[in-house]
Amino acid sequence: MIDSHELKRRDSYLNKLIGFQDTEPVKVITGIRRCGKSSLLKLMVQHLKDTGIQPEQIIEMNFESFDFRGMSADDIYHYVKERVVTGKRMYLFFDELQRIEAWEDAVNAFRVDLDCDIYVTGSNAYLLSSEYSTYLSGRCVEIKMLPLSFREFLDFHGFEVRETQSALGGLRKQVFDKNGERYELQEVFDAYMRFGGMPGIADVGLEQEKALSLLDGIYSTVVIRDILEREKRRGQKQITDPMLLRKIILFLADNIGSSVSIASIGNTLVNEGLLDDGKRKGAPSAHTVQAYVNALLESYFFYEIKRFDIKGKAYLRTLGKYYIVDIGLRNYLLGFRNRDSGHAIENVVYFELLRRGYDAAIGKIGNAEVDFIATTADEKMYIQVTESMMSEDVRKRELSPLQSIRDNYEKIVLSLEPGLDASYDGIKSENLIDWLLSE
């Protein structure tokens, strides 16, 4: 078991958990495997101990561990009941609870029978699917966890950003490691775009071979445990072809940020000869492809973003896009080469918006498109993402959709080369890396 003093803090998530401490809802932490959910539970346990909660009031169960293998919901209930300290509030931590059949029965029993505060993690959205959410309706709060942001990446890898003065007197940001070695900010951002934000990369270092090995382990675990095995446990027979699953994963990874329909996935795989293994005749049905894509969404491997008609003020049912949860996983799947970097930085912006609490949609305005409409309960902004704003043609292409939106919400173009102009008729032009580093 990892000691929590060795763990890097992820304050944005920990503070959310602390904010819900000792409230009735079950705290459910969701996200792809190995994005840091178990570590977050450890940090919360340490916080409880630091604030006076006695160790005997805390019960931790990790259902990936051999210690708790094969347990039923009844077994969990009795295990906890035997360890309850009379007259004290208990703090219950259940890691990867979706592996237990009828887990919700035990959780509900604890809520009824004990004075307790419950924390749960799960690597599959099935944990909170409609089938089970009826049991916890209104009684749970979901904390959605993602791999490291660029700021967290810097922290986890021991980098510090400092402003230094250039020979001409201007200020520029540079990065220093623990040994005082200096790097250009772009160089470290390139490493983030190469290796991604899985926390485990910080343990093995920024070396391609070690990173590939770690990412291979994550990929295999997600596919085998969270998709193929889960389907067997559910008694469903939809996800039965590991080869088709991998081909769909590769297709979606290669087409992040591109408009994709379910029909186009199957047709493309057939037309490009990607299913010519002698076993499958013709294109897989749309129903089959949808089932495989849903399984990938439920395992938090990919996220779907919908299109929103800005003038009609309605979501469109056709041609959404998919983004991959970690750019390092994409590079592991497709190869570590500079491919489609425009969509790759778009991918990074999408997940940064989610981290900051925004809902994101693609904006449709006439025949044009805005990369992201980002909204919260009281805020809205339109965002375009491009590699460079140095070319007149690119500026026109990126600014035109924003200029055609007739409202007063903030409009921003994020790029790695914003040029000299900080704004164009009220549309901000910002450096993407500076935006990622901002609060």
Where are these regions (language model features)?
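A cross-kingdom feature that marks ATP-driven nucleic-acid transaction machinery
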Residues: I2-L7, E24, T30, S39, ...
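Pre-Walker A adenine-sensing motif
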Residues: S4-D22
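Interdomain hinge/linker elements that couple catalytic modules in large macromolecular machines
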Residues: L7, V161-A344, F351, D359-A360
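Conserved glycine(s) of the Walker
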Residues: G36
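Short glycine-rich substrate-engagement loop in P-loop NTPases that contacts/grips substrate
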Residues: I59-K88
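Conserved P-loop NTPase "ATPase switch" module shared by AAA+ and STAND
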Residues: V85-W103
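Structural recognition of the conserved hydrophobic beta-strand(s) that form the central parallel beta-sheet
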Residues: D117-S123, K144
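Short regulatory helix/loop adjacent to the ATP-binding pocket of P-loop NTPases
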Residues: Y126-E142, L154-F159
